Amino acid sequence: MILKFLIWALLFGSVWVSAEPILPLHSVATDARKVALGRQLFFDTRLSRNNEVSCASCHQLTTHGADNTARSKGVAGRLGDVKAPTVYNSVFNIRQAWDGKAVDLKAQVTLPVENPKEFATSWPVLIATLNKDKAFLDAFTQVYKDGLSSDTISDAIAHYERSLITLNAPFDLWLQGKGSLSEQAQEGYRLFKYYGCINCHQGKNVGGNMFAKMGTFGDYFGDRGTPIEPADYGRYNVTGREADKFTFKVPGLRLAARQTFFFHDGSEHSLTGAINTMARYQLGRSLSQAELEAIAAFLESLVGQHQEMTQ
Ligand code: HEC
Ligand code: HEC
């Protein structure tokens, strides 16, 4: 009898645990000395032309790891082509950028450096500038004996980004049986699964692990009311495959409730508006206001903490 129960518990207990499609966030291994150097570089405006902006100008860590605009301003106030995503929890993404053009965090660093709408510089110029700072160079060389290069600078920044994980979200604590969750948020989670948001937004980061077309059940771009821009082609710009047109990396939703603009084009500026658009264009559904609010409450419960955050 006891044996039977044990076998049952083993089978179904483990099935239940692994069947939950969202998992709690956890920290990942990283090197503290590299994290410290990476942090310095992340906030250093000398990485950009004329010392105008740093990574942190667009990825504001005190809020949600992005800025509160639809399009970020790079050097000389130039506006970017897409909305800045958060850097928090980005280590869990299968690829970086909306179209996945960077294979990992380290590869991503070159994009803002060379982008004329972001840092508008080059590695040789940037390295020459930093090499003049004797104190920084000494500290850097103690950790990276080969000194400053695109490889070592990118590595340090990527290490810092690996440390940007938001822990102890109310939802995670509830999943682990360590905290309670409001009825409304629980209902939101149920709807999130029931309607199929979970088919795309899943795993630790509630997204970030696959690509999907924007507008599965409707012509999102046709209805948007603004002309299609090159960035709207998404993953197609990287692969050239017809099937990848209008396809984007499914964004992680861990900090979605903190955002003020949504989607790659920053076209939506309310959370319930974004959920409504998703229901309509990705699932062919029309949700009630109460359902939208329940899902918003669930998304709010996904917001964890990090020491860089002030709220
Ligand atoms: C001028 C604003 C701006 C600056 C400066 C900037 N970024 Fe970004 N960042 C963006 C935008 C916009 C995107 C989206 C780009 C795309 O998808 O093509 C992005 C994407 C990213 C991503 C991918 C996140 C994801 O979920 O795909 C990471 C990581 C990142 N930036 C880190 C950095 C780092 C590190 C620096 C400094 C070396 C930096 N950014 C500088 C605006 C900026
Ligand atoms: C078919 C896959 C798919 C489904 C189903 C889906 N999404 Fe999305 N979601 C995406 C993609 C892809 C994007 C990015 C689209 C873009 O930027 O143009 C996105 C973006 C979002 C955003 C904006 C995040 C940001 O950083 O701007 C929110 C919020 C969101 N989804 C919530 C939901 C909710 C809630 C549901 C269920 C009602 C849902 N999604 C269903 C694929 C999906």
Identify the meaning behind each predicted range:
Residues A9-V17:
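Hydrophobic h-region of N-terminal signal peptides that target proteins for export
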Residues W16-Q311:
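Periplasmic c-type cytochrome electron-transfer domains
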